[in-house]
Every structure is written in C-alpha cells, then in structure tokens.
C-alpha cells in the first residue's frame, strides 16, 4: 500500500532485484546482463591472444633466422639482448605500464609483443636454424647465387613453420590468460568489456559474499574452456606435423 498527500495523484512503482539471475547469464549488482559482457569479451580475448602470438612468433622467427644466417656480431648482439630481456620481470613491467602510462588494450598488446620478442623462443629457433643452415639444399641455393634474403625467407623460414604451428596454437591461451590477469588486477582497458574485467568487477562488487557465484564462475569457465580447447588443438596438430608422433 502507498499513501500520498495530494488528491488525484498516482504512484508508479517497479520492483528491482539486484544481482538476481535474469536472462542467460544473470545480472551483476548494477542490473547489467552479464551475457553481453561475456559475448563481447570473447572476440576481444581471442583477438588479443592471436595477435600477441602471431606478432611474437613471426618476429622471433625472422630475428632467429637473420641471427643464424649472418652470425658474427649480429648473432652475438641478439643473444646478449635475449639474455638480458629474459632476466627482466615480465608481469611487473606490464603492471608499471598499466599504472603509470596507459591501460589501453592496444598499448598493453604492443608492450606484450615487444617484451616477448627477445625471449626463450629466440634461442629455440636459433638451434633449429643452425641445423637447417647446414642442409644440402641451403648449400645448393648458395652455390647458384641466391641472395641472403631469398635464402632466409624462401628456404629457411618456411622450413620451420610447420614445426611451430602446434606451439603457436598452444601459445594463444597463455596471452588470453595474461590479459585476463591484468584485468583482474585492475589494469584492464576500462572502455572494453573482457572476461578479466568481469571477474574484477565481481570481486569489487562482493559477488561471493552476496551469493552471486555465477558472476565469477561464468568468465572463469570460459577461460578454462579456451585453454582446454587450444591445448587439444595444439596436441592434435603436434601429432600431424611431428614426424615422431605421426605413426603413433
């Protein structure tokens, strides 16, 4: 019942239930449908992981091929830069960039690629290219006068790509988890809905304390499914491209 102090006045009331399950994925403490954030966050998470994996892998592949082919001071310089970069704390640097510079997803993506280029992959690819460099077809290409660029990009790099595909596929979810980790720490892009941002808002809104477990479980489940799916695909591709596992 309602009481008014003016004759002929009317009251319009609407019942609002905060945090109750409504729609496909439920709502948060501000009555926003979580399915919208989860659906919008899916292509963003996958695109972040894909671009980071592509940028890192291709750059490492080219740098390793150039380092192996030319050798000398170029190879020594790249190895020293790699050794120094591997000592640097990766996550704290990203936290500093997000805290003091910018939390834009494009800035974070560029920083992740730049910090990941001179990593352990450089040394792994270099060891593979050392074997390819001594192959007979490389000697044949050198004997008929092929240029350095042609040998690197036409004969060396394509030779290694099939062996890198399984590892490349498995690398994508690691960058998806990295972006989500930064968002959970409050360093995600405030203008873009991501899975990590949903978990961060669930923590800030007291989801577990208020019994809204779905608010945390749904994005966590999507992250788990993403990692599992790429792991299965990477394992299957490894059995296809790895000659040692092909007959098993």
State each model region's role.
Residues 1-30:
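Membrane-topology segments of multi-pass transport proteins
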Residues 27-248:
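Alpha-helical transmembrane segments of integral membrane proteins
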């Amino acid at each position: 019942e309602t009481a008014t102090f003016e004759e002929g006045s009317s009251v319009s009331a609407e019942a609002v239930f905060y945090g109750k399950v409504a729609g496909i994925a439920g709502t948060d403490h501000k009555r926003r449908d979580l399915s919208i954030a989860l659906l919008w966050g899916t292509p963003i998470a996958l695109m972040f992981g894909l671009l980071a994996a592509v940028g890192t892998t291709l750059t490492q592949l080219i740098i390793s091929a150039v380092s192996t082919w030319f050798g000398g001071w170029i190879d020594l310089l790249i190895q020293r830069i790699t050794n120094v970069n591997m000592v640097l704390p990766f996550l704290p640097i990203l936290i500093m960039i997000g805290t003091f510079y910018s939390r834009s997803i494009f800035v974070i993506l560029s920083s992740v690629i730049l910090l990941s280029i001179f990593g352990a992959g450089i040394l792994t690819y270099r060891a593979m290219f050392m074997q390819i460099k001594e192959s007979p077809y490389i000697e044949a290409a050198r004997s008929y006068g092929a240029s350095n660029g042609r040998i690197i990009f036409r004969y060396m790099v394509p030779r290694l790509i099939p062996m890198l595909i399984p590892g490349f596929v498995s690398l994508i979810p690691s960058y998806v988890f990295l972006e989500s980790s930064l968002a959970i720490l409050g360093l995600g892009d405030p203008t873009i809905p991501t899975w990590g941002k949903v978990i961060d808002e669930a923590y800030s809104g007291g989801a577990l304390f208020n019994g809204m477990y779905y608010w945390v479980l749904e994005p966590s489940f999507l992250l788990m499914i993403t990692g599992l799916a790429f792991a299965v695909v990477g394992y299957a591709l490894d059995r296809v491209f790895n000659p040692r596992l092909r007959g098993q």
